[in-house]
């Protein structure tokens, strides 16, 4: 019997599906595969680079479509339907963003801005939690610039105001801030849903995250899911029908997805 609707899961990776510190997901790998085999469409929507998500797919053993660098580019929709695009780029390249940053941001704010790519390898390893090839993949960015901002809240708000007035944004992840084009996870998610609706009559979206840069994505889906993060205050989140786990990733990811699918009677 044909299902009444198609389930599409948009998921953050670090701290949501992958363990926040070890980046492992072995304990839920079979569950993810079983979902795909049931016809559930899973789309990683992450700040990770193309290389990093491609290697995640290799480890999983399935080529999933994905959104990389905080919504900057969409990949592999042709894996869902052959006439869908293989790649959509929604961002200007990082060099163009940096040029705007250099020309428009006041010097006093620039002094508080520390690019990860210009730090020593040891500092990069400590901040990103990666080494060797994995560190290289994490730094292999085309559309975003990860950085630390060592200013106060008022200075950060001033920086954000300058960036927004020049069509740039800040995306806050678990480890770093990212300088991005005027794009984010939810804009890319909505773009994908619009494309999928060309062939799917009814779609139910589940979004999974664990941090501040996931909240807009959670607010814009049918079933929002938050994976436990002890560095994140859940009580401050005002999202209707929010499902949240008591366990961290990766087990917490499986818990919220199971609850979401029950809610959908899937």
Predicted regions and their residues:
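Anion (oxyanion) recognition and catalysis
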Residues: 36-37, 164, 219
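Short, acidic loop-to-helix structural element flanking the phosphoryl-transfer center
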Residues: 19-39, 94-95, 157, 182-195
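Conserved acidic, metal-coordinating active-site core of Asp-based
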Residues: 108-206
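Short, structured coil segments at secondary-structure junctions
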Residues: 60-62, 70, 166, 220-222, ...
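Mg2+-dependent phosphoryl-transfer enzymes with acidic/Ser/Thr/Gly-rich catalytic loops
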Residues: 2-4, 25, 176-266
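Asp-based phosphoryl-transfer active-site loop
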Residues: 4-22, 218
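The start of beta-strands in P-loop NTPase/AAA+ ATPase cores
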Residues: 7-9, 64, 205
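Active-site phosphate-binding/coordination module
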Residues: 24-117, 230
